[in-house]
């Protein structure tokens, strides 16, 4: 699966049902929050990252922020974009985007198809194969823009994404060689549709309706012992030792966002610009979890030998919200805006293990909003100060080991104070923006895990509890500078500090009070230099550095800081572009994820295990583009 974190807040996994994401994720208005694998990014036009709570316009799924991916829209003229790549580790991809305008200039259409394949950077010694962790990702997308008249227009998006990846990424030796006899799968087949209608109403304003739906079938499975009987017998003298877990999910969403924006030429009282809206989201998810084992020692349920168990569950959540905002000019260059969102979330959960004692339905009434002051300082410089409140709904803890008082957890709220500046003028070689922020988390939801049987790598309990408070604060900046007609440098940087505050109860023994939150690196820095010669030659060298961070709240294991470099060299000639690229130029070894638990028999000592990031990869990409006229 693909998860996101913003300013140190977000998810890193979902092993059970009852999803509850902190980062909203949209692709062409279609909600894929918590299931981000359809972001294959071919023919992408823009990725907008809204950091911090989006309590007015988006609500419960955007406590930490919102990521919105916009793919290329239809144009007025015939257009064609084709791309093919080959690379090391048997990487190859091909994609095509084609579109044209409609008769009488009333709109346009665009069709996209792309396929990406790679072996996944692992070698499974048991099968002597390089594809057990491989990638097989296909995308089909169609977009239609129709201008009915000067006032009414419609945009329709249809998409199908088929992710058929393997999952065999872990080794007890923390290397790229695995020993799994039951390699897992990381699959997602998603269909999505979005219809955006915009109507300009004379004397009132603009009415916008966005209706979207998505259906995702997800398979997530893995070899629970990361080995095979021959390997474990030779390594430890113990066998059989064989565990496997699979989770089949079917998630559906249906959403409607109806918004009326007042005509700015007819502001209320001559100075108030306004917006009102209503939002509804229905999410359902059915899960089938299966565990299988063949163990020399006690497996799930306390019996040695072979066996299996299953857990079927159903989850549903309905969000309904009303929101609005006002903006007023305080002078020729200064404006003040405020927004308010009131949202109700009803959620229910039931599973086959607790059918006799069902989970009580949970209802959360939540309020968010923002107050912002902006000032145009002239010469392309803008300043802002924002106070915002975001929120996230409560949820359920699953499993027979969960105590009755821990079966549910309450909503979390977040106050954010942010100030920043932006300097941008087309004729100016320097483009810059920077901000500082402080976020206070109240009734902070903290995700915990505990291994119940030391001799069983699958016997885990996962649960979320509300800690007292937390804080996240830092500095972010990004910018670019043109050194001349051929050279440009760019970069971004962030400093982040996070802490748990005033924890109690189940968290006391963990010693996390004052400690940093997981997946919250202290710094992140990127820098790039680009060269574009008049003859079509170009080059780009970029570097990305990341500080260490805690993997989980439940233990004190941390990653190591690292940096990666990438290089691209190429030439443009007419409609053709060819580029040679190298990712992870110096073949750095770094960890993407880490676990700390007992896996290796016979004593099963707790120890650290790492999932390594991708090694150096070299490839060639060729593009063909016909000029396009933007609408």
What is the predicted function of each stretch?
Residues 3-5, 22, 26, 49, ...:
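N-terminal periplasmic accessory domains that precede
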Residues 14-15, 19-53:
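Short acidic/polar hinge/loop motifs at secondary-structure boundaries
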Residues 15, 162-175, 282-286, 346-348, ...:
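Surface-exposed extracellular loop regions of Gram-negative outer-membrane beta-barrel proteins
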Residues 79-81, 86-118, 122, 126-165, ...:
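Transmembrane beta-barrel wall of Gram-negative outer-membrane proteins
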Residues 115, 196-200, 206-224, 376, ...:
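Membrane-embedded beta-barrel scaffold of Gram-negative outer-membrane proteins
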Residues 145-151, 159, 260, 271-273, ...:
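Structural signature of Gram-negative outer-membrane beta-barrels, strongest in the C-terminal barrel
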Residues 261, 275-277, 329-336, 438-440, ...:
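Gram-negative outer-membrane beta-barrel transporters
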Residues 440, 484, 545-552, 571-631:
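C-terminal beta-signal and adjacent terminal beta-strands/loops
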């Amino acid at each position: 699966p693909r998860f996101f974190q913003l300013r140190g807040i977000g998810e890193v996994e979902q092993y059970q049902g009852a999803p509850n994401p902190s980062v909203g994720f949209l692709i062409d208005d279609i909600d894929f929050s918590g299931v981000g694998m359809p972001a294959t990014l071919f023919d992408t036009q823009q990725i907008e990252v809204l950091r911090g709570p989006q309590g007015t316009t988006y609500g419960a799924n955007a406590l930490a922020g919102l990521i919105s991916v916009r793919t290329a829209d239809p144009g007025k003229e015939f257009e064609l974009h084709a791309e093919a790549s080959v690379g090391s580790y048997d990487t190859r991809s091909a994609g095509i985007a084609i579109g044209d305008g409609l008769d009488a200039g009333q709109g346009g259409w665009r069709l996209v198809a792309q396929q990406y394949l790679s072996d996944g950077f692992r070698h499974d010694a048991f099968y002597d194969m390089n594809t057990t962790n491989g990638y097989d990702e296909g995308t089909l997308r169609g977009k239609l823009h129709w201008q009915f008249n000067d006032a009414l227009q419609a945009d329709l998006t249809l998409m199908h994404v088929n992710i058929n990846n393997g999952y065999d990424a872990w080794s007890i030796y923390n290397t790229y060689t695995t020993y799994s006899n039951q390699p897992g799968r990381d699959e997602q087949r998603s269909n999505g549709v979005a219809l955006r209608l915009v109507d300009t109403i004379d004397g009132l304003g603009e009415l916008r309706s966005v209706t979207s739906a998505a259906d995702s079938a997800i398979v997530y499975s893995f070899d629970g012992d990361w080995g095979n009987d021959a390997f474990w017998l030779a390594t430890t003298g113990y066998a059989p030792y064989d565990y496997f877990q699979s989770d089949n999910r079917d998630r559906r969403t249906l959403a409607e966002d109806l918004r009326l924006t007042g005509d700015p030429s007819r502001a209320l009282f001559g100075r108030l610009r306004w917006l009102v809206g209503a939002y509804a989201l229905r999410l359902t998810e059915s899960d089938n979890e299966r565990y299988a084992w063949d163990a020399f020692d006690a497996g799930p349920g306390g019996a040695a030998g072979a066996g299996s168990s299953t857990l079927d569950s159903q989850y549903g959540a309905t969000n309904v919200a009303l929101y609005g905002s006002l903006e007023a000019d305080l002078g020729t260059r200064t404006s003040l805006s405020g927004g308010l969102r009131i949202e109700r979330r009803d959620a229910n959960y039931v599973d086959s293990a607790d059918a006799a004692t069902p989970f009580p339905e949970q209802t959360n009434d939540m309020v968010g909003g923002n107050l912002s002051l902006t000032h145009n300082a002239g010469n392309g410089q803008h300043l802002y100060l924002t106070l915002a409140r975001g929120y996230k709904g409560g949820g359920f803890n699953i499993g027979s080991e969960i105590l009755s008082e821990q079966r549910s957890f309450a909503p979390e709220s977040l106050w954010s104070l942010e100030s920043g500046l932006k300097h941008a003028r087309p004729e100016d070689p320097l483009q810059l923006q920077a901000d500082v922020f402080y976020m206070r988390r109240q009734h902070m939801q903290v995700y915990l895990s505990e291994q119940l049987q030391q001799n069983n790598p699958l016997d885990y309990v996962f649960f979320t509890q509300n800690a007292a408070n937390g804080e996240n604060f830092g500095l972010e900046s990004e910018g670019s500078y043109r050194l001349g007609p051929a050279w440009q440098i760019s970069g971004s940087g962030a400093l982040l500090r996070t802490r748990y505050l005033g924890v109690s109860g189940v968290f006391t023994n963990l010693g996390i009070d004052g400690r940093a939150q997981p997946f919250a690196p202290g710094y992140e820095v990127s820098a790039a230099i680009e060269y574009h010669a008049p003859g079509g030659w170009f080059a780009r060298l970029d570097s990305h550095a990341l500080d260490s961070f805690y993997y989980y709240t439940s233990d004190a294991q941390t990653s190591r800081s690292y940096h990666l470099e990438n290089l691209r060299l190429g030439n443009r000639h007419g409609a053709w572009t060819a580029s040679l690229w190298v990712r992870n130029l110096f073949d750095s070894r770094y960890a993407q994820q880490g676990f700390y638990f007992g896996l290796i028999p016979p004593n099963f000592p707790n120890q650290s295990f790492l999932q390594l990031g991708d090694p150096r990869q070299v490839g060639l990409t060729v593009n063909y583009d016909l000029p396009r006229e933007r609408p």
